[in-house]
Amino acid sequence: RDCLLSRGLGDVYKRQELWESATECPVVFPDGVGVVGWMVPGGREIAIKTAELMKKYDVVIWAHHGMFCSGEDFDLTFGLLHTVEKSAEILVKILSMTPNKLQTITPDNFRSLAKDFKVSLPEEFLYEKQ
């Protein structure tokens, strides 16, 4: 079974499960999201790990805790946060009904979207699922 609970948290985001939940996601966060595995919040170690990931991603999720977002201004940052949260909510609802998605956005759909919206998407995220 290929479901959220049988994969590691990092794999969920590397595979861009969030992108597949809402069409606007690859346009709003084309680099994907970074994930910090569970760590004690509030300490230096988690701050350093988060800062490292924020160099690459505009969104970093703390496993079992929360999310950090960065943008050019408040409105863009709030919109980013809202888009990620909405996509995660859709994903959770889908996976609560079935472990396998019955339909999804294909890699070629993502490539077309990227072309039309003039964004670059990492090819490593664009592959056919087995």
What do these predicted ranges mean?
Residues 20-55, 71:
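A contiguous pocket-lining binding segment that forms or flanks enzyme active sites
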Residues 56-130:
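A conserved C-terminal secondary-structure "cap"
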